[in-house]
From Swiss-Prot:
Entry EC no(s): 1.12.98.1
Organism in which the protein naturally occurs: Methanothermobacter thermautotrophicus (strain ATCC 29096 / DSM 1053 / JCM 10044 / NBRC 100330 / Delta H) (Methanobacterium thermoautotrophicum)
Annotated protein name in UniProt: Coenzyme F420 hydrogenase subunit gamma
Keywords, sorted A to Z: 4Fe-4S, Electron transport, Iron, Iron-sulfur, Metal-binding, Oxidoreductase, Repeat, Transport
Enzyme class: oxidoreductase
Length: 236
């Protein structure tokens, strides 16, 4: 990914998000110490590095959806695509828009900002790590997989780069209604807002709690495993 014997250069770009993804990256140093200290160089980030001009980088982690009324964000997004070898939609706001997609404007302190979309609607995205926020463990594993060129581990994240809409309803329409649900409960355990409960071995959605992050669908093993792999794992 980078020149031989050189640390991969990583940049962090913050758009329309709550900074929760950055906190997951920087405030879990006990988990990420080896990664952040010895394995990569953080070369850009508004709150991480004292640097005004965006440099060339191997990987850009983008937090937050992009506001179509914010010219600075639109320019920054275009620039990072030109300067980064790989772009990662980091967190659900960047990957799927999360609840920011449903903004109608009028909010303080930027009432004119009313249209928010996932970054893949505007630029090519190489991989996505959803979550609100992503766990520090998955951050570390994803970056290490990139360093080791472990494409098998990264394949679901590569596939998710083109999946820009998400809702707990996806479990019903794409898993349960297709006869694929095994009742494992992984989706309910993954939901960070407790919008999902398991009832009679099937997920039941409380739409008032759902923030459209998509992590429940992503964590469901039936959402991305090919049929041949499912049969192999189950011995069928």
């Amino acid at each position: 990914m980078a020149e031989e014997n050189a640390k991969p250069r990583i940049g962090y770009i913050h758009l329309s998000g709550c900074t929760g993804d950055a906190m997951s990256l920087t405030e879990n140093y006990d988990i990420l110490a080896e990664l952040l200290t010895n394995m990569v160089d953080i070369v850009y980030g508004q709150t991480l590095v004292d640097l005004w001009e965006m440099p060339e980088m191997d990987l850009a982690l983008v937090e937050g959806s992009v506001c179509l009324q914010d010219e600075h964000s639109l320019h920054e997004l275009k620039e990072l695509r030109e300067k980064a070898k790989l772009v990662c939609a980091f967190g659900s706001c960047a990957a799927t828009g999360c609840f920011t997609r449903y903004s109608r404007g009028g909010q303080q302190a930027q009432p004119s900002h009313e249209s928010f979309v996932p970054i893949a609607d505007l630029i090519d995205v190489d991989l996505a790590i959803p979550g609100c926020p992503p766990s520090p463990e998955i951050i570390a594993k994803a970056v290490v997989a990139l360093l080791n060129n472990d494409m098998e581990y990264l394949q679901p994240m590569l596939d998710l780069a083109g999946y820009t809409e998400a809702c707990g309803c996806d479990l019903q329409t794409k898993v349960v209604n297709q006869g694929l649900c095994t009742g494992c409960g992984t989706c309910a355990m993954a939901c960070q807002t407790r919008a999902l409960d398991m009832t009679n071995g099937r997920p039941e959605l409380n739409s008032d709690r759902c923030i459209k992050c998509g992590i429940c669908y992503v964590q469901c093993p039936r959402s991305w495993w090919p049929e041949e792999q499912i049969k192999k794992e189950l011995g069928l």
